[in-house]
Amino acid sequence: SKQQASQVLVRKRRANSMLEETKQGNLERECIEELCNKEEAREVFENDPETDYFYPKYLVCLRSFQSGLFTAARQSTDAYPDLRSCVNAIPDQCSPLPCNEDGYMSCKDGKASFTCTCKPGWQGERCEFDINECKDPSNINGGCSQICDNTPGSYHCSCKSGFVMLSNKKDCKDVDECSLKPNMCGTAVCKNIPGDFECECPEGYRYNLKSKSCEDVDECSENMCAQLCVNYPGGYTCYCDGKKGFKLAQDQKSCEAVSVCLPLNLDTKYELLYLAEQFAGVVLYLKFRLPEISRFSAEFDFRTYDSQGVILYAESIDHSAWLLIALRGGKIEVQLKNEHTSKITTGGDIINNGLWNMVSVEELEHSISIKIAKEAVMDINKPGPLFKPENGLLETKVYFAGFPRKVESELIKPINPRLDGCIRSWNLMKQGASGIKEIIQEKQNKHCLVTVEKGSYYPGSGIAEFHIDYNNGSNAEGWHINVTLNIRPSTGTGVMLALVSSNNTVPFAVSLVDSTSEKSQDIVISVENTVIYRIQALSLCSYQRSHLEFRVNRNNLELLTPLKIETISQEELQTQLAILDKAMKGKVATYLGGLPDVPFSATPVNAFYNGCMEVNINGVELDLDEAISKHNDIRAHSCPSVWKKTKNS
């Protein structure tokens, strides 16, 4: 009704209302029991911020109730719980709770504001932000020695695997697994490391988790070496084919060519016939058919350092008569035999001086004349023709640097047919060169070096074999090896001397290897694959020859040349000498200039020696002409000169 509607605007004053004007306003009295305007609300709060905050919310509370209900409700204090609670809650900033429930400890109401007091580990106006103690710069890593784990409002320290937390809850201590479980690695060695343990094996072995044992690593299956790889328990060794001119590089894995350290003058001329082209057999064979009035004659220039060997051998077609021109003791020797006589004569000056000497042999009517430099040195009487003509022809066969094998038993005095020398300007049977130059020109191996020196030359492509008895019954040591080497190498790597047993092991070897020092070489003495002596950093590739002397028996190896050496321990040396002693009681062959076909791994070095070398063993100078076998390119008594640079070279 109109009457009821108008009562919303009615405001009745209470008793003593005049006295109330002098007191601070009361929220219950001013705005709940009665309606209040903003000014009246300010009387309650006595400040603008709280008033400005309260009054809009107060109007919301009023509008949330119907006016009819409100009029009835204000007759009793107990009848307005909803409005009262709504209005009473407006000034309390902590209701509803503005703080983060997890992070706050208390909420303090203020004038249109509130203050949240945070629990430890929280921050922010409403305590809504967790403090990350693990990133506190003033307390690095939260004071944890290893792991700091941040949690809402707190944090805790933890340890990595293999560590345990100490009582201070911050520091970690390593767990020694090897002490806790001594057998956990089986046959391997247990090594404790921070936070863990390792099962260690010697170098070259790998740990097997399943068997708990150390197993050999086959490095060769991993293609570690450029050429040959030999695996052995705990390691491996790379080898290069020295016989093909390779050596092991400094990295001990790759191969590189054996380089020349001293160039030699290997120039040859086809006009010079090399007499030592073949180790066994003749170098050149000629056959002459001349009128019966012809007599044997030979004229040539001859150069050698060799003291013995066959220059030429001539015989009749039916082998009934023969003539041998040779060198023995450096002098010309003539042996002849026919139906009339059998003779041997040696005479004249020594001509194995490395100079060119003109030699002529001429059959005269009653003698054979031998001349050197056109001066007669021998005149051998003969009762008749040296070779008998048949059917009006004189047929003669001439052999250079040797004779047919069957002749050897018919000689008046045996002679080693091998002769290291050269012939030029030959004239046989007064027929001049007779096409011989054309034959020689086509074959490079028959050409002689232009310049040579005295010595023996190893070309880096072959070996010489000797059978030497090293046993000495009068010596208490049983056997001994006394060696003297005079060397002038052309390459810095190669086997100079080796003893090889019947089972293809190499119980003793003396080799040359390039040193780690620039332009120098080492000499290594080895027993099988173990280096027992190393003579370091020698300048061997020079014009001057180097001298090395040593002696070995079952108890000791003694270097007689005053050089700096590096050796293994005395105990290990005796072990290696015992290996040598066992081999020396059996059969061994002596090789110069390299090795026969033995495994690469038999010695530390397997390349051929290249250069000049003279060898004396147990007081005997080894003559390569007396070797059991010798590579054809090895020169027994001549060595190429060192290449001398010219201004134009």
From Swiss-Prot:
GO terms for biological process: blood coagulation; fibrinolysis. Keywords: Blood coagulation, Calcium, Cleavage on pair of basic residues, Disulfide bond, EGF-like domain, Fibrinolysis, Gamma-carboxyglutamic acid, Glycoprotein, Hemostasis, Hydroxylation, Repeat, Secreted, Zymogen. One of its GO terms (molecular function) is calcium ion binding. Residues 15-60 form the Gla domain. Residues 1-14 form a propeptide. The iron and 2-oxoglutarate dependent 3-hydroxylation of aspartate and asparagine is (R) stereospecific within EGF domains. Plasma. Residues 61-89 are annotated as: Thrombin-sensitive. The keyword Lipid metabolism does not apply. Its main location: secreted. Disulfide bonds join 31-36, 94-107, 99-116, 118-127, 134-148, 144-157, 159-172, 178-190, 185-199, 201-214, 220-229, 225-238, 240-255, 422-448, 612-639. GO terms for cellular component: extracellular space; Golgi lumen. Residues 90-128, 130-173, 174-215, 216-256 form the EGF-like domain. The modification (3R)-3-hydroxyaspartate is found at residue 109. The modification 4-carboxyglutamate is found at residues 20-21, 28, 30, 33-34, 39-40, 43, 46, 50. This is Vitamin K-dependent protein S. It comes from Macaca mulatta. The lineage of its organism: Eukaryota, Metazoa, Chordata, Craniata, Vertebrata.
